[in-house]
Amino acid sequence: HVSKRAQATLFVHPNDHPYDSDLVQMNREGRVVAVHGKPHAEGIDYPNCVNAAFYLMENRLIGQIPVGISSDFGRDLFPRWASEHRLFAYASPEYIKDMGKPERHAEVERAVTTGKVSARNLTQPQRAIFLDRDGVINLDTDLIKHPDEMQVYAFAGKAIRQINQSDFISVVVTNQSAVARGLTDLDGIDAIHARMDRQLGAQGAFVDALYYCPHHPHGGFPEERPEYKIPCNCRKPSPGMLLAAADRFNIDLSQSWMVGDSPRDIEAGRAAGVRTIRVRTGHGAVPGPEPDFWADTLEDAVARIFTEETPTT
């Protein structure tokens, strides 16, 4: 809040019902550029970035609230203020939940008494399941460059929903060299991920965070973008994306997992120090280093993780 010189900072997170939630759209610097109040028009893709109704605001902005007029932050004020004031978003998997209804109050009460709320505080080490995207969550049609090419597997929503309901956070780490090849740009990648969010949200699932590498080390493509044709530490099999997430979310890598379909996913997981599962979807038949475990699909991989994490007597 202070470093951004924000007039207001909104706590945002994904949830399992984005279709009936107020959604916050921000730029790559975290500045809020739009707030889309519910209900949403059919067929519109928005990132699953939900207004959690928890704000830090400067007094001078509070003074902009109309006196004597009923105003809702999500519906009336933030959509207008996004273009007039410095609004920023703080995105986090930490536990924040509206408990204005009896059933939600009971759910929050259980989360407090079981220790889930305190465990999700980022001062505590987190466990993560890192997920490759193409061939794991969605059909790999080779260098997806348009939202219409995003087809989430039928089993992916159930699998990721099980992660959402567990003590793990879900983090997508994906190579997207279509940017370096000039087939799309960063806005195009964001649009593709918004489509993925909408498809997962329709299945009651979400990813807590997403990292992608737009680079590619080799030149020679007709429409390539030279600024992205560079060696980097983020492109798998390098572990840069996993390490960046670990730093941001205080992830204990020794207690975390990587699920991928390609050899580079397994190599990245090994380099980061997480346990690895390779699925047989996507590029699962390509020869490569042996993972810790094999699974047919993401759903099977998640089931295997939970089996391995369950203490035996």
Predicted regions and their residues:
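Catalytic-core segments of class I nucleotidyltransferases/pyrophosphorylases
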Residues: V2, N15-P18, R28-S118
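Conserved Lys-Pro-Asp/Glu-containing loop-to-beta segment of HAD-superfamily phosphomonoesterases
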Residues: R225-E227, N233-P263
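Active-site neighborhood of HAD-like aspartate-dependent phosphohydrolases
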Residues: Q126-V171
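Metal-dependent phosphoesterase signature
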Residues: N138-A154, V179-G188, A202-Q203, R225-C234
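Residue-level signal for inorganic ion chemistry
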Residues: H1, V24, G30, E58, ...
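Substrate-recognition element of Asp-dependent hydrolases with the DxDx(T/V) motif
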Residues: A156, I160-M196, Q203-P222, G269
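A short, conserved acidic/glycine-rich loop-to-beta-strand motif
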Residues: K4-P14
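Acidic, Mg2+-coordinating phosphoryl-transfer loop and its flanking beta/alpha structural elements
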Residues: W257-D296
